[in-house]
From Swiss-Prot:
Encoding gene, per UniProt annotation: CRO1
Protein name: Calreticulin
Highest taxon listed in the record's lineage: Eukaryota
Family: Belongs to the calreticulin family.
Gene3D superfamilies for the chain: 2.60.120.200, Calreticulin/calnexin, P domain (2.10.250.10)
An MF annotation (GO) of this entry: unfolded protein binding
Transmembrane segment boundaries: none
Signal peptide per UniProt: 1-29
Taxonomic lineage of the native organism: Eukaryota, Viridiplantae, Streptophyta, Embryophyta, Tracheophyta
Any one cellular-component term (Gene Ontology): endoplasmic reticulum membrane
Positions with biased composition (Acidic residues): 386-401
Disulfide-linked positions: 115-147
Function statement: Molecular calcium-binding chaperone promoting folding, oligomeric assembly and quality control in the ER via the calreticulin/calnexin cycle. This lectin may interact transiently with almost all of the monoglucosylated glycoproteins that are synthesized in the ER.
A biological process from GO: ERAD pathway
Length: 424
């Protein structure tokens, strides 16, 4: 009896486990695109010929970079300064309607970027990938952009009705020379989240943080401020009166401490007058004091009315066609490395992917970078020392030449004196 009960218990546990696994499988995220730039990556990506005829198209290198956490973990890196870059990959077309969309990738600016982009684009429809460039329409643009001191931010741009809409929030990007993971999550409730290195940096409503739709309400264009509306917050104090004789107070008065010089001659110098000084009693033009207006009604504002041009879009977050991912940018200084692309509908899956790629190597990469910087500083210090030695050698050589010239001049002078003596 006990054995039968135990068998029933095992069976129930097995069923429960099976149901749990089925539940996990049912909610498991879907991966629409993933790229770690391993073997065969070139067959999945198309290098654009955009700007090639102008000799302004930059080349991509397949590399792990100058410093890394794993030399076998490679991405693609811009390799030429002052060049345009464009490359794209196609994946099975889908729409994020009624589902979450996650776009994630890592980027490293090894060149200490001072002007250039590090963003990616999602595109729909049919794209001629060989002609993919700056004028190619896109659905989403996301990622860091740096240029000088004024631009150091994460771009998040949505294209709706053939118009690019920029996020109204300022989201700072990373500016060091290490790899960082940028994640954009778009939820079907029209909210979004931006993360850097799996840490949330910005979130909110797409309705509020982008001007995609016209406002729901507008000021009534027909409304006029009533003529008797009192919008003066302060008024002159009727009890405040100007003192008698106030206007007669002079701005300057003769200096009472001034004395006529003893050698002053009225006939020759004219009548002496004391110099003037600012009058301490003079307070400037009289101004009536002001008091709060008891009838103040506040600043008049036109009443708000429903905007006749507003039309709600419950799918403001959605894009009907997402079919390509592309990198299109201009770089003054090359060296930006892209890796670990992921498009999915599961934020947790994206978080795990980031930890298993970037997170796994970030400490080793930081150590490699620190070692490279240390070596660079030592080489620069050694070169500076060599330059100082060269300068010292040049100075010593100049001194020797000067001494030789002085000795030569002295000898010539002696010979000349001897000749003159002989002549005498």
């Amino acid at each position: 009896m006990a054995i039968r009960a135990r068998s029933s218990s095992y069976a129930a546990a097995a069923v429960a486990l099976a149901l749990a696994l089925a539940s996990v499988a049912a909610v498991a995220g879907e991966v629409f695109f993933q790229e770690k730039f391993e073997d065969g990556w070139e067959s999945r990506w198309v290098k654009s010929e955009w700007k090639k005829d102008e000799n302004m198209a930059g080349e991509w290198n397949h590399t792990s970079g100058k410093w890394n956490g794993d030399p076998e973990d490679k991405g693609i890196q811009t390799s030429e300064d002052y060049r345009f870059y464009a490359i794209s990959a196609e994946y099975p077309e889908f729409s994020n309607k009624d589902k979450t969309l996650v776009l994630q990738f890592s980027v490293k600016h090894e060149q200490k970027l001072d002007c250039g982009g590090g963003y990616v684009k999602l595109l729909g429809g049919d794209v001629d990938q060989k002609k993919f460039g700056g004028d190619t329409p896109y659905s989403i643009m996301f990622g860091p952009d740096i240029c000088g001191y004024s631009t150091k931010k994460v771009h998040t741009i949505f294209t709706k009705n053939d118009k690019n809409h920029l996020i109204k929030k300022d989201v700072p990007c990373e500016t060091d020379q290490l790899s960082h993971v940028y994640t954009l999550i778009i939820h079907p409730d029209a909210t979004y989240t931006i993360l850097i290195d799996n840490v949330e940096k910005q979130s909110g409503s797409i309705y509020e943080h982008w001007d995609i739709l016209p406002p729901k309400q507008i000021k009534d264009p027909e409304a006029k401020k009533p003529e008797d509306w009192d919008d003066k917050e302060y008024i002159p104090d009727p009890e405040d009166k100007k003192p008698e004789g106030y206007d007669d107070i002079p701005k300057e008065i003769p200096d009472p401490d001034a004395k006529k010089p003893e050698d002053w001659d009225d006939e020759e110098d004219g009548e002496w007058t004391a110099p003037t000084i600012p009058n301490p009693e003079y307070k400037g033009p009289w101004k009536q004091k002001k008091i709060k207006n008891p009838n103040y009604q506040g600043k008049w504002k036109a009443p708000m009315i429903d905007n006749p041009d507003f039309k709600d879009d419950p799918y403001i977050y959605a894009f009907d066609s997402l079919k390509y991912i592309g990198i299109e940018l201009w770089q003054v200084k090359s060296g930006t490395l892209f890796d670990n692309f992921l498009i999915t509908d599961d934020p947790e899956l994206a978080k795990t992917f980031a930890e298993e790629t970037w997170g796994k190597h970030k400490d080793a990469e930081k150590a490699a970078f620190d070692e490279a910087e240390k070596k660079k500083e030592e080489e620069e210090a050694a070169k500076a020392g060599e330059d100082d030695d060269d300068l010292d050698d040049e100075d010593a050589e100049d001194e020797d030449k000067a001494d030789e010239k002085a000795d030569s001049d002295a000898e010539d002078g002696k010979d000349s004196d001897d000749e003159k003596h002989d002549e005498l």
